[in-house]
Amino acid sequence: VFRRFLRICAFYGASPTFIFSSATVANPAEISEQLTGLRVTAVTKSGAPKGRKHVVMMNPDASPSRTAILLLKAALHRGLRTIVYAQSRKMTELIAVWAGSKAGAFANRISAYRAGFLPEERREIEAKLSSGELLAVISTSALELGIDVGDLDLCLLIGYPGTIVAMQQRGGRVGRGGQDSAMILIAGEDALDQYFMRNPEELMNRESEAAVVNPFNPYIMEKHLICAASEMPIKTNEPFMAHPAIRRAVSDAERKGLLFRSADGQTFYSNRKRPQREVDLRGTGVRFSIICSETGKHKGDVDGFRAFRETHPGAVYLHNGETYIVENLDLDTRIVRVRAAEVSYYTKVRASKDTEILEIFDEKPVHGTRVCLGRLKVTDQVNGYDIWHIHPSQKISSVELTLPPNIFETEGLWIDIPIEIQREIESQMYHFMGGIHAIEHAAIGIFPLLVMADRNDLGGISTPYHQQTGGAAVFIYDATPGGSGLSREAFHKAEKLLSHTLNVIDTCGCENGCPSCVYSPKCGAGNKPIDKTAATVILNGILKNRAVPFRAKPVLLENRQSQKDAENTEKYYGVLDVETRRSAEEVGGWHHADRMGISCAVLYDSREDRFFEFLQEDIYDLIKHLRRLEMVVGFNIKKFDYQVLGGCYDFDFSSLPTLDILEHVYQHLNYRLSLDSLAKATLETQKSGDGLLALRLWKQRRIREIIEYCTSDVRITRDLFLYGRKNGYLLFTNKAGNTVRLPVNFNQSPP
């Protein structure tokens, strides 16, 4: 958004000054420069008023949530205005419900607050908190920064929030009026919380982390490039086009039909007038509306990724202390239907994941292994969900689901596991898959110690054999489509990541693994299999070995496809067009094309470089000729010409390998173009007539003239095909009146 704004300002000769503010981030100038592309000067002296702040670290025997509720109850009775931070939306709602049930007279003075609430609901909660009508709020990071919530006294953190910056931001919500305040960190069972409980001085003495941003995230950048082009056409010689990532994103957007390149190749136009309406500044994906089926009221929103995990059919959905059951998840309309219900259980999804390496950015040896950084395609499949009783917490049953996979591209790193170590693990009868699974969990858990991140910002996959790496590997990737820069940062600290992971596992006092070391609350496989001992042996084997075993570089599957496409450039092809005896009106509509009859058909043969003519009685000879071809080319051939032919002869024309130029056009533009309009823009020629002319000629039995007309259409279709195959695009005049390029891939094998 900043760069779009600056681009327009530069066009009009304006040079605005930006003022950025941050209370906590360690690299304010750097992050501001990355956001704007401008040089920034940092002013780091703070003049904010401060009272005394007490910091308490608790490692409770009871669950962190239960401990927080007891502390909140005590705080309410003492009149302390309190904010409680939970780590997830669902936990925020659950704690608000549980706390309200135990708060007695204070029940109506407690509220949940999280993203997904409607804007008016959030504003109402903020106003009540500022006025004192609410004494306590249970929130996610939604109340972490950017909102003034009044003079609060006590901050309860249910679990370490992942970064020092986040902890300072949350703790900074209290004592803003200069009064004494307190922040209590209630440790959870996960690795990072327990690490700081064992090393409290490190938590207190750690500096704020440097913020990480990926200004070239292709998912986000693509949307803003389309907006930029609609605001002002993009020129290829603009300064920002010098960056390879931007050039690549523009090229991808052109290929998808989101940007149109001018005929001379120097300017890009947006495919829409107002693409800004479809851009969500708060997320990268689509959003689903949550509607109460009983009242029709809009209860909130959820992003596309969370929709599968939090609002699948049968899920328990919590909203502002109220419980709903999800009745339906409609992927076409992006609407989630829920109904109010009082239940004593909650739901947790079960999922599986797969990954494909698309590109390798970098690689390096780390002790006895190789660590790589690259672009990945992740397939996340929700398979079902488990139903858990709230009190006591125990699984009641499991339900299977049939949902489409969530597929996205992102950035990630992966650690090769040497085959020698795998053989050693298996010879000692340890569970190898359980070992690398444990490493994946522990590494993600300790990840925020090295990079400013939350474990929810990451995903992981461990596999005993990956087809592309040729062996076992542990993948850790950015959970944000396109990548957020976290894996890139961690790649440079790979040695520390491995050593810290080993330290967390080694120093945990449990015997077989626990949430403090190798269990993950996010695991879609229910933390099975897990082998803590195997993980220790694997990591020790890697860190004590300096010789990196040889393994071939991963095979990139897209390269195989490009080689295959290159082989298709010299296919034996024919170009076909058919003229009819009767019009659509005469046979009752276009859907009755099989009743139109054939006045003539013309086929161009690329091997013989000549045109062949066929009448209706020659249809069998035409089919024999078509079957010899490696590819049949036409314009609207699948929905029209083949239908006409099928009405005259019983043959499955869909079995022929066919390239339909109009089909390519529609897939790219989502609307149709005429053969004549493409010929005028691309070839600077035009059709010799139209279909109505051919029908008049048939009624007059002027067959030779029909054949000449049909041959002219075949010649135009052939020349469009050859132009597109050579140049990778056709030309057309868009709705704004600009002659622009339409990308095509006529070298790809037809289905």
Predicted feature descriptions by range:
Residues 139, 158, 320, 379, ...:
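Short His-Asn-centered micro-motif
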Residues 510-517:
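Short cysteine clusters
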Residues 540-567:
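Acidic, low-complexity intrinsically disordered tails
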Residues 558-631:
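Conserved RNase H-like, two-metal-ion catalytic cores of nucleic-acid enzymes
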Residues 603-677:
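Conserved DEDDh/DEDDy metal-dependent 3′-5′ exonuclease domain
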Residues 683-742:
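Acidic, Mg2+-coordinating catalytic module of metal-dependent nucleases/exonucleases
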Residues 1-234, 238-275, 283-285, 295:
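Helicase motor core with emphasis on the C-terminal RecA-like subdomain
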Residues 181-183, 189-206, 224-239, 251-252, ...:
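Extended Lys/Arg-rich polyanion-binding regions
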